[in-house]
Amino acid sequence: MIIRFGYVSHATALWDCSPAKTMTFTSWKKLKKQEREDKLYNVTLQNLEHTIRILHYNIAHEIPLYRLSSSIVPLATHPEVEFDYIQIFAPLWRKIGALIQEHNLRVSFHPNQFTLFTSDKPHITTNAITDMTYHYNVLNAMGIADSSYINIHVGGAYGNKEKAIERFHENIQKLPYHIKRQMTLENDDKTYTTSETLAICQKEKIPFVFDYHHHIANLCNEPLEELLPMIFKTWSHTNVLPKVHISSPRSEKEFRAHADYIDLEFIKPFLHITKKINHNFDIMIESKQKDLAMLQLICELSSIRGIKRINSATLQW
């Protein structure tokens, strides 16, 4: 069984390399037209340059997975901000895509919790479609839209989970097919359990990104030993491996919050289940220390008898 690793957005080992420098709408509105354009251009340019720097870091360290920042382009989906970020930065988008393709990196996006399809308010669904379209357009500008995924949560329950799930199935049909085809769903830590998310994924033929920490925080009745093979099977129509999110609790009191590093004892039960299934898969580390947490976990795992480190961020078990 081969397990590959990656991390989210910021490479903490790199100095001053945030790919998500921001600009608020309030500050944008205070500026004159040319100042607005200049500020948006400069912040986006810096985020793109930092993304390229991070990708080179990943390539040098043989890290095959990476979650791109959703905030590369500030105010990209704000209705009052007109900024042709695709055309203006076309050469840089292509450069990023070429790096990703040349080195066979697996990249993804994860829009924020407000991008959901369970609301009974039409404008919420409209905003979700706008946000998903932004992420897809960026992937398309990179030339990797057909091989990369956009991950979201199911959404809220609004006091009636069954009705909310019905709305999800109804609202998701409004998302253009070419974008829906590149989306994944993740179980969450409070509302939609692993089994509930799996049922939605199976019905909509959407790959399931399983989050182990969320699963433990929001358990369902079905044992994970039975669910995980079905979760992995939701990826069978794609050309990529199943992906899993790993983090561990900050403390008993703050159980849902992510710790700086991974507690190996916390994830061992999950790893033993995957060993029984013996299916290759990818792990996205969601700890606060990101790449450093990932590398520390790989070192700890590679010291276990029977686990072999193939390269910097890939293990064989």
From Swiss-Prot:
GO terms for biological process: nucleotide-excision repair; pyrimidine dimer repair; response to UV. Belongs to the uve1/UvsE family. It comes from the Bacteria. GO terms for molecular function: endonuclease activity. Its EC number is 3.-.-.-. The gene is uvsE. Component in a DNA repair pathway. Removal of UV LIGHT damaged nucleotides. Recognizes pyrimidine dimers and cleave a phosphodiester bond immediately 5' to the lesion. This is UV DNA damage endonuclease. It holds the Pfam family UvdE. Keywords: DNA damage, DNA excision, DNA repair, Endonuclease, Hydrolase, Nuclease. InterPro entries: UvdE, UvdE_bac, Xyl_isomerase-like_sf. Signal peptide: none annotated. The lineage of its organism: Bacteria, Bacillati, Bacillota, Bacilli, Bacillales.
